[in-house]
Amino acid sequence: MASTQPKNDAKSTEPKPEQPVTEKKTAVLEEDDEFEDFPVDDWEAEDTEAAKGNNEAKHLWEESWDDDDTSDDFSAQLKEELKKVEAAKKR
């Protein structure tokens, strides 16, 4: 059973000391700042993809970066919903 008396929370009645706002400034990079380069990987010829490919050109990535596949169910459902919305607007 819940108590009808409000709780006396000591934390809520004490005034909070005001904390000074300190603004941290980030270091600004200048044009002449030097950056550490990555080490050069020295690959052995037999460790490369060309050595394993039997002189066959292997596609390591897709020729087309177009991810728009309009034949999936979601695209078809979306097109139907758009048609319904357009029809409702014309009324």
UniProtKB/Swiss-Prot annotation:
<dbReference type="GO" id="GO:0008541">
    <property type="term" value="C:proteasome regulatory particle, lid subcomplex"/>
</dbReference>
<dbReference type="Pfam" id="PF05160">
    <property type="entry name" value="DSS1_SEM1"/>
</dbReference>
<feature type="region of interest" description="Disordered">
    <location>
        <begin position="1"/>
        <end position="73"/>
    </location>
</feature>
<dbReference type="InterPro" id="IPR007834">
    <property type="entry name" value="DSS1_SEM1"/>
</dbReference>
<dbReference type="GO" id="GO:0000724">
    <property type="term" value="P:double-strand break repair via homologous recombination"/>
</dbReference>
<feature type="compositionally biased region" description="Acidic residues">
    <location>
        <begin position="29"/>
        <end position="48"/>
    </location>
</feature>
<dbReference type="GO" id="GO:0006406">
    <property type="term" value="P:mRNA export from nucleus"/>
</dbReference>
<feature type="compositionally biased region" description="Acidic residues">
    <location>
        <begin position="63"/>
        <end position="72"/>
    </location>
</feature>
<dbReference type="GO" id="GO:0000502">
    <property type="term" value="C:proteasome complex"/>
</dbReference>
<comment type="subunit">
    <text>Part of the 26S proteasome.</text>
</comment>
<comment type="function">
    <text>Subunit of the 26S proteasome which plays a role in ubiquitin-dependent proteolysis.</text>
</comment>
<dbReference type="GO" id="GO:0043248">
    <property type="term" value="P:proteasome assembly"/>
</dbReference>
<feature type="compositionally biased region" description="Basic and acidic residues">
    <location>
        <begin position="8"/>
        <end position="28"/>
    </location>
</feature>
<keyword id="KW-0647">Proteasome</keyword>
<protein>
    <recommendedName>
        <fullName>Putative 26S proteasome complex subunit sem-1</fullName>
    </recommendedName>
</protein>
<comment type="similarity">
    <text>Belongs to the DSS1/SEM1 family.</text>
</comment>
